[in-house]
Amino acid sequence: AIGDKPGPNITATYGSKWLEARATFYGSNPRGAAPDDHGGACGYKDVDKPPFDGMTACGNEPIFKDGLGCRACYEIKCKEPVECSGEPVLVKITDKNYEHIAAYHFDLSGKAFGAMAKKGQEDKLRKAGELTLQFRRVKCKYPSGTKITFHIEKGSNDHYLALLVKYAAGDGNIVAVDIKPRDSDEFIPMKSSWGAIWRIDPKKPLKGPFSIRLTSEGGAHLVQDDVIPANWKPDTVYTSKLQFGA
């Protein structure tokens, strides 16, 4: 039975049984992405565009996991009301919701909520406002050729570097990020700042280029040498040559 207390954290187990959750949707555009600024508590700014395409969700704490659940992928489906197709659709976690209405709660974009409907019944399903859905964690897949990217956040400097990690396939979510500056022989752990953003506040100035090591929830590691150049700039995206499972 669904209660109003959060359930156990959802971990990276695949092929698992379907669990039950409550679903709502948010945003001023019932057919579009949400939130209205196309951002959210994970730190993304473009959830209306590929590869998210507006198919996004706010998870409550067992799903969001204080930001460590950002980017995780879920199949969702509904059986009732009659407008539900019963066919699973894929959503990615890009935001957090704080409503204690169920053990598990997906606050979906209007587009994602409507995607659970039979063809042509999307608007009717959205009129339900709230329903029970079934969900399960699945591996994240991105279009062929998509590589992991690093967005250096505004305000970063030689004594404060913040990275937003995007487009990680497989587990989707990252549980550790380590950085190796030019003048270091060892990787230095970064701290989880908020959402999908990781930061480091070194005592001595940082000097690039920087190598980055990522660890996924399932324990997979990727290392990209010198992915961030010596002349890096804030509010800039740097694309790696790597992808989990590639």
UniProtKB/Swiss-Prot annotation:
Domain Expansin-like EG45: 39-145
Record localization: Secreted
Domain Expansin-like CBD, residue spans: 159-240
Keyword list, A-Z: Allergen, Glycoprotein, Secreted
Predominant cellular place of this UniProt entry's protein: secreted
GO biological process terms, semicolon-separated: plant-type cell wall loosening; sexual reproduction
Gene3D superfamilies hit by this protein: Expansin, cellulose-binding-like domain, RlpA-like domain
Record's protein name: Major pollen allergen Cyn d 1
Glycosylated residues in this chain: N9
Family that this chain belongs to: Belongs to the expansin family. Expansin B subfamily.
Classification via InterPro entries: Expan_Lol_pI (IPR007118), Expansin/allergen_DPBB_dom (IPR007112), Expansin_CBD (IPR007117), Expansin_CBD_sf (IPR036749), LolPI (IPR005795), RlpA-like_DPBB (IPR009009), RlpA-like_sf (IPR036908)
GO cellular component: extracellular region
CDD domains registered for this protein in UniProt: DPBB_EXPB_N
Superkingdom to which the source organism belongs: Eukaryota
